[in-house]
């Protein structure tokens, strides 16, 4: 049996500061890379020059320069469509991969649509904390899986229908991994890359712009302001689009909890909200983002109020993310 081929897809925009370190960590992988596709979204710094330098030295690197700015969502979609290998690994421009990242994910993916891993997150690798996401179908109603941790089957990733328009690409891919072909997701529960948190991070900037008053270490705020934001988000077109997509594409016989919860999140009455809270409390071990915090009485309280905790600083449904050219 032949080993599957792997493509790495990276999208760049003004990433000169950390780009070399990330490229070097990809080139140092213990598993062979068939193609490294890097698509630059009209950078104004030295990013393109760095990419062209690597392209001249490494035969399997292909650099594409966009003629106009696409934004990160459409940039990743169009870049992924260029890949020809069996499996596609998604890469940010400012991470660092562990040498065995691809090898361990190739060994784990089996017949699944998607394999992801835990990762390190922080300003410095030495002080970074481990992020290990939940990935049950119902957990993906509240939070996606980081794209930079993903290894995805190409025939699945290049299906047009998994790219939910105006929504974060990696979140829609994760949900689609269950809804299409029903192959689902597998996890390597060890950190295989370091994801930098720094002042230029796009998601961080967007969050601070939308919630300038939010607390770094909140206490009561998620319970109070989270409810208000939950009701506000329910009116957003992106909210309705995403949860309608999940409800319409989830088979109730295969994913009854996912289907039921997506339906409740589309309803505005108090009874539906209480039912949703009760389900979150009951299934908190597979839904709440940090398993350790879902234990005991406090865990039950967190589980019940998780729709509000999730909504407290949720900017996903406020953003305008296009997939159309």
Segments the model singles out, each with a brief description of its role:
Residues 15-28:
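Short, well-formed alpha-helical segments that are part of the catalytic scaffolds
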Residues 88:
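Short aromatic/hydrophobic "clamp" motif used to bind/position activated sugar donors
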Residues 167, 179-185, 191-325:
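C-terminal subregions of glycosyltransferases and related glycan-biosynthesis enzymes
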């Amino acid at each position: 049996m032949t080993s599957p081929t792997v493509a790495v897809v990276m999208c760049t925009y003004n990433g000169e500061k950390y780009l070399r370190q990330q490229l070097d960590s990809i080139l140092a992988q213990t598993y062979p890379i068939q193609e490294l596709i890097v698509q630059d979204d009209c950078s104004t710094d030295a990013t393109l020059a760095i990419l062209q330098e690597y392209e001249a030295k490494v035969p399997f690197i292909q650099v594409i320069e966009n003629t106009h700015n696409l934004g990160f969502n459409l940039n990743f979609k169009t870049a992924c469509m260029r890949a020809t290998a069996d499996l596609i690994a998604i890469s940010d421009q400012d991470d660092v991969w562990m040498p065995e990242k691809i090898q361990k994910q190739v060994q784990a993916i089996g017949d699944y649509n998607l394999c992801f891993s835990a990762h390190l997150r922080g300003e410095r690798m030495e002080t970074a904390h481990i992020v290990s996401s939940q990935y049950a179908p119902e957990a993906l109603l509240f939070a996606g899986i980081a794209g930079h941790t993903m290894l995805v089957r190409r025939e699945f990733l290049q299906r047009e229908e998994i790219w939910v328009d105006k929504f974060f690409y990696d979140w829609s891919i994760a949900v689609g991994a269950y809804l299409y072909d029903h192959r689902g997701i597998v996890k390597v529960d060890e950190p295989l890359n370091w994801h930098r948190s720094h002042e230029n991070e796009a998601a961080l900037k967007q969050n601070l712009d939308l919630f300038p008053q939010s607390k770094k270490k909140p206490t009561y705020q998620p319970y109070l302001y989270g409810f208000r934001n939950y009701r506000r988000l329910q009116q957003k077109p992106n909210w309705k689009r995403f949860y309608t997509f999940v409800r319409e594409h989830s088979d109730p016989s295969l994913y009854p909890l996912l289907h039921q919860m997506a339906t409740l999140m589309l309803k505005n009455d108090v009874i539906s909200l209480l039912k949703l809270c009760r389900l979150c409390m009951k299934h908190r071990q597979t839904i709440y983002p940090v398993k350790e915090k879902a234990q005991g009485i406090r865990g039950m309280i967190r589980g019940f109020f998780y729709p509000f905790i999730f909504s407290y600083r949720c900017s996903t449904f406020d953003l305008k993310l296009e997939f159309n050219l």
